[in-house]
Amino acid sequence: MSTDKSPYAAFSALLASSGRDRSPAELHGQLLGRSCAGAGFEVDAWLADAADLLGGQIPDNVRQALIGLQEMVKGELTGGEVAVVLLLPSDEAPLAERAAALGQWCQGFLGGFGLAAGDRPLSAEAMEVLQDLAAISQVQSALEDSEEGEGAYMEVMEYLRVAPLLLFTECAGPVAPAPKPSVH
């Protein structure tokens, strides 16, 4: 019996309890990809994309979790962060499970980015990042459960924490901060 209390495990359990057979990593990747491509942070548009990925109507508890996930992503992308937090299994999970989730995250990111970006021209640097993500999405079975495999996983994960910011800067540009209520 797993005692993993990570956000990934909690989100995974929530999805499973609602009959959804999707990885939290893939959902997070899709959200981050669409956001980085300039889709914006409008909740209903994100929920519609998530419903398509999840195969239909979203139960309220999953809906609330998806809204929370979007708020987290919006804060990371617009708050001057130097890296994003990836929704992946904890370090205690077997390397094969973490590598598979990393691949799912990349697949979700590419799907979300592609839907939102359309045929927009991209810089050579942005194209290279997308090509890297496509290559990483295929890596899950290539990592061996060893110190070397662990090191390669960590290196790829660190790259993925900063790569989305390049794409966001190029495609989405600056987002106006939410208006603060005036105090009278």
From Swiss-Prot:
Recorded GO CC terms: cytosol
Family (UniProt): Belongs to the UPF0149 family.
PANTHER family: UPF0149 PROTEIN YGFB
Name under which the protein is recorded: UPF0149 protein Avin_47340
